[in-house]
Amino acid sequence: MRRGECVLLCGRSGMGKTTVTKLINGLIPQFEPGVERTGEVEVCGFDPARCAMHELARHVGSVFQNPKSQFFNLTSNDELAFGLEAAGVDADAIEERIRATVGALHVEHLLDRGVTKMSGGEKQSLVFASVDVMDPDVYVLDEPTANLDARAIRVLHDQIAAILARGKTVIVAEHRLYFVADLIDRAVLIEGGRVAREFSPEDLRALSEEERARLGLRAVDPAVAMAVTCPAAPACATGALERGLSLRGFASLRKKRRVFAPVSFDVPRGAVVGVTGANGVGKSTLVRAMAGLERATEGELRFDGAPLDARARRRRCSLVMQDVNHQLFSDSVRGECELSAAGVDAARVDEVLAALDLEHLEACHPMALSGGQKQRLAVACALLAGWEVLLLDEPTSGLDFGHMVEVSRLVKGLAERDICIVVVTHDCEFLSRSCDFAYELEAG
């Protein structure tokens, strides 16, 4: 890569895109025990394997797949200042650089906030801001849009364009190709840990839908990627549904602050219902409250006409969290599935593992999987558990086209077994393929 170039790393989940980014930022081999590097890597004149990390960090800034893995502070302001303080920058200069960065990124609403209370998308935006404030020469972005809403993606696109205009170098490992298609100089397809093909921006846009699907690539045209074609949600019934979920005036307060406003909607048995909305409006808190993991302070939730308190909701509902690292406990992929599938025969476990392209990984430790593979494993566990209500929070985060389609097929197949499914997602392709209708959650 030349200075000032923007290169996209694309391809199916688990093919080695994140590994390439770790070679560039020095995490391999410096922070990956047992991993050996052969060959040569040079970044800004340094070999990342032999350069002190604090020195390399002046030149290379990284945004990881899981934003929580790179926070060092409890508040957003401290997080933004952390790298500059470690580099010995003057306090007045730190304040000025933070002010300029949050203004350019339009993330002023993230200042003076507790990091742990932010939504997944807000955390992603904060991580990018904490990297940008350091003004590195090279930006390494691993799935930077995984948890972002449409507005935040547009802001990120414009900021990458501004970074490139300053002569910076950008490497993006990403499945959402549409948001960088007009910024890149070339795209590199990674398959099986090797460079399989390279595309110019024109060649990438010229790929047919069949060719993209064969390569595991998502839509390149924003008009296709952002189109939502599922029907509008029907009006709420006067009373609770006789068969399905009914929320009436359902709301949550946290420290006297309303996390999401009272909501009322229905999820019939056999339906897949989408929930969309901007980052931070309370979508994840809503499904956590529906699952009995967060306190609901107003309204009620009924299932098949009967009210459910928090304990009853925990018995009826299965939640696949946005950060699936919180719900992987076993020491193998198969063990994880069997933990969730008490009473399910081995053939059914084999079937689900094969459907989600995990059968070749069944002996692997869940924490050794890529982000997309972990996501598919969490979905597999939920499918095997046999709950009556399935809640999915960003289930396609980090998934390539083929695996997104497979999750969609399995979710729709599960709905046919007469269960209720709610999907929180920013993924318009998945929403259009999977949901019978959708609700949009707004602040207030």
Question: Which positions does each model-derived feature cover?
Answer:
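Helix-to-loop junction immediately C-terminal to a conserved catalytic motif
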Residues: N25, A291
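Conserved ABC ATPase "signature" region
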Residues: D92-L110, A346-L361
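Catalytic Walker B motif of ABC-type/P-loop ATPase nucleotide-binding domains
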Residues: Y139-D142, L390-D393
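ABC ATPase NBD Q-loop/coupling interface
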Residues: E40-E55, E300-R313
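H-loop/switch region of ABC-family ATPase nucleotide-binding domains
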Residues: E174-H175, T425-H426
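The feature captures the beta-strand-to-loop junction immediately N-terminal to the Walker
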Residues: C10-R12, T276-A278
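Conserved ABC ATPase signature
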Residues: G114-M118, E122, H365-L369, Q373
